[in-house]
């Protein structure tokens, strides 16, 4: 795992690298010389030990100290090892054979020989005297060449301390490396990192160790050789060899031993490179030259053959990174003893530049267990030169790519404190048992360029131990030393070694063998080493305990301080957070309050401004309306005053004229009555005298006339006329001058004329007859004519007879009549042009009521004329009756009457066509006189003949006309006006006095009630706008009210009308919407306030009134128990039934009215859902009224609710509940089918089946609907008029005698217009006077030679009857026998033929 290097890393430079290399060479040379001199001066001699054995004792002590330091990690490695070590000998043998090929050892081999004595001594001196250890390190730093020379001069190679190392399934012993100590005061002046140089020096001392996990073994060779036979001890006293490197006693001084003995030098180097337990920092640097030599002497091929792909670069991306070594010595620690981490590019340990080998197939060795695990000791990772680093991301075995030298290259690093997984960490206890050296030649150890960890010299720092495998605990008996209380390990014999000869031969060099040490010296040396080791161990344990106690106390203090600081910081943070939260909440509350206050103020200001604007606009509107109303009222008042003045004047004039007329009439009536009374008295006296005189004169005249008539008949006729014409002028003058004595002079003139006529006429009979005629005419005229007519007649009586008409002279303006044409057959007739000349002069009617008489005469003439073409007329009846009588005997009372009437269908045809025979006529006809006068049949006589006979033959006179008995117009008195007579209110009621000149009077509630109710009754879709405007004008009266009384009254009347007429709910809902939109905002109710305590105004007030009324009635509900079946027949006619029916009608009307209001957006959808939920609340035992109201409401608003998404989901729920209701067992069928109709209507898109549900229609819509129905009926009419083989027009005796005509339908009149038109043509044809028989049309058509077929309609039969009447057959002999018998026989034959034809058609 790598981390990104710091950004301030200096860029690579070849010049700087060259200067650094040269500086390292010079520094290494100087450091070697200084270290040699310092080591000779400051050699430490342990007390109580012989001079010859000083170096050995020191070395042993150092070795024991080093073993103590590394014993914990090594023991853990040994215990964790699970692989056997029986192949150790073979591995070592193999290694020795490979290394024996080199006659000359590698330059760096001597640095890898372990020396525990120098390490232990160095460690001990570091604990006791830090300044001394620095000097000792200088003394021990000897050149490598010196060490090699000394080692070759010895005869016998000393045994080397080994440690078992496991390579997968192979275990071998590896020598414990050591390296001479170099000066720690050397400064890094070359620009190469001190960490890199330190790690290089350490790695150079352990190049013989392979990069695998090291395993500790027993101290003695015997233990290692017998390891396969029994379990290994879990703890050991020491891991180092106690004998010198050459294995023989030496009498050289300690300084020589320190400087020349390779084992001592390597031990000292190892001790110097081991981490200080006391936390002190001792810088230790090696030269760059030795590093370059170590890199140059790396045996690449031998390393590859021995370890395979176990190099860290081969497992570059593994989680278990290896090949790194951390050096905690030198300047890597600060003043407090803690590791110092440097953020420099040179501080990163990059992989060495390995050659690109191809894979050899040994992939099994690449597992994490076969790779060495480095202990993270907390120091900064080690970095090698950039020129030797492998490019980051380069895979082993692949060709290298060229890297820019100016590019910063970094390798993967291990963070401090990193402990890999899967391998637990265990601590070892030190052991003191010495082991004989198993020396090997320096040539047998392979060099490595990559620094590997030195397990013998490096110890974990900050409590970290090497990662080793856990070994099985040994069950061998332990031997404890009573003095040191440590375990004693029995040393093994050299003969027990697997191959001692090979082991010794490994250490052999081309030089002479070293001298052998006697047993006494060996035992002495061993005792000395033991004492030194025990002392050192004790001191080390005390120091370690003290250090641990101090460290623990320090750590505890730091932890306590840190914990207190954290707690304090936490409390402060909590308090701060709490305080901030409180401040924030307070601030937010203040801001919210402030914002709300601002919003309220703003809202109030806006509302105030809006209210002011509304009030201002309202005031302006009111003022404007007031001005307009004032102007209008003023104009109306002026017009009204003017009109009233005119009416008053007119009325006064009429009254005055009427009074005057009444007075005049009264006066004239009085005078007339008085005059009539006088005249009556006088007339009675004169009449009495007149009667006597007339009787006498009459007798005489009759006698004379009779005689004269016998003599000259011409004089009889001409004399009266001549005398009358001669007396015309004199009668006029007399009438003009003496109008009052007309009756008195009448008799005198009559007598005078009589005398004249007697003297002038030669024949007395002629004069007598003429007198008699004149008197009789006078008598009749005086009784029936008015006074003016009587005057004319009197003048006629006074006129003279004209004897010669040609002698008469007429005025120039008058054209005389034609005398030649006038004198014919003894008569004189005036032509019409001559008489028309006097039209303008003679304007008097002949008698009273002349116009009425003439109207009656003309009307009777027209009625007689029109009745000629009708079957109901008396003239036609008499005419047809006479004809029928001649054929069929007297009337229809004969034996064939039943057959004729039943077969002809006269009872049906005549009654339907308006004939006089039937009583059930469908059409009104002219009054028939003939039938009423002449009784049954009406055919025995002629009404016209009887009427003429009565008039001409002096029959019974008609009763006198009632109009002639009434008093004249002049004598009619006006009606007296009663006091309590009816008069229009406009005339009777005086205009109400206004409160002021500008104010109009308010209509009282009863007037509003009457006017609004009348307007609502007259409201239709065509008059909707006009009538609604009138009602709105009345409702606007509430502007002058504070409680909206008039508006409430209008709403109440509208609501009652809408609920009482459910079919017109749509129209009344539209009217309510118009009122809400058009109502004035000035209308208010001070008793109804809104949420701001302001009176509700305008349309909102109207909506509130209306909805409150709807809600009140809807919540109260309705329930009407209507009677059903026979049990309720008595109740149907009762008053309670009608009341209940009205309640039910209004309840359903209310529901529909509410739905119509919702459709016009006056009610919200939420209110509709609440209503539906209320009606669907009970699904177990619902009321009939609720279900019926629900169905009516859903049929009204269902389509609107179902159109929205939310409403559709709610409607699904409603339908489910309705289905639940339909499944109730005892539910009435009416309610069930009603619910099913609603559900079916929803499935069909809310289609409405009932026409009533669709609402009112205009007249145009009704006409269009009628036309559509007519077209549909015509399209559905059958092409043939036959019905089951029988005539639809004719009756049949076998079908009840009434005929088989189908009943009339609603479209008969429209469908039969053409038939009635043809019937009218037939009637007009009858006026021509043609006569025909009443026989059947089939007979007539048959007689004419046509086919006997039944017609499909009555109109066609009437047309045939008309044709038969017009053209009677001439070739058929009419006999006195009944012609209907022939029809009967023909019908029997035709019925059979028709049946045969029907059977053929059906087959």
UniProtKB/Swiss-Prot annotation:
Residues with the modification Phosphothreonine, per the entry, are: 884
Q: Which GO terms describe its cellular component?
A: cytoplasm; cytoplasmic stress granule; cytosol; eukaryotic translation initiation factor 4F complex; nucleus; perinuclear region of cytoplasm
Q: Name one Pfam family in it.
A: eIF_4G1
Start-end of Low complexity biased regions = 190-208, 231-248, 270-291, 325-334, 757-768, 868-886
**Where does this one sit in the cell?**
Cytoplasm, Perinuclear region
**What are the GO MF terms of this UniProt record?**
mRNA binding; structural molecule activity; translation initiation factor activity
Residue numbers carrying Phosphotyrosine: 923
Q: What is its main location?
A: cytoplasm
| Region Disordered, annotated ranges | 1-381, 439-464, 488-774, 861-1003, 1266-1403
InterPro entries attached to this UniProt entry: ARM-type_fold, eIF4G1_eIF4E-bd, eIF4G_eIF4E-bd_sf, MIF4G-like_typ-3
Comp. bias (Polar residues): 1-11, 19-39, 50-60, 109-137, 249-269, 346-381, 439-460, 493-508, 720-737, 1302-1313, 1328-1341, 1348-1358
The record's keywords, sorted A to Z, are: Cytoplasm, Initiation factor, Phosphoprotein, Protein biosynthesis, RNA-binding
SMART domains in alphabetical order:
MIF4G
Question: Per its database record, what is this protein's job?
Answer: Component of the protein complex eIF4F, which is involved in the recognition of the mRNA cap, ATP-dependent unwinding of 5'-terminal secondary structure and recruitment of mRNA to the ribosome.
Similarity field = Belongs to the eukaryotic initiation factor 4G family.
- PANTHER family, per the entry: EUKARYOTIC TRANSLATION INITIATION FACTOR 4 GAMMA, EUKARYOTIC TRANSLATION INITIATION FACTOR 4 GAMMA 2
| Name of the protein this chain belongs to | Eukaryotic translation initiation factor 4 gamma
Source species of the chain:
Schizosaccharomyces pombe (strain 972 / ATCC 24843) (Fission yeast)
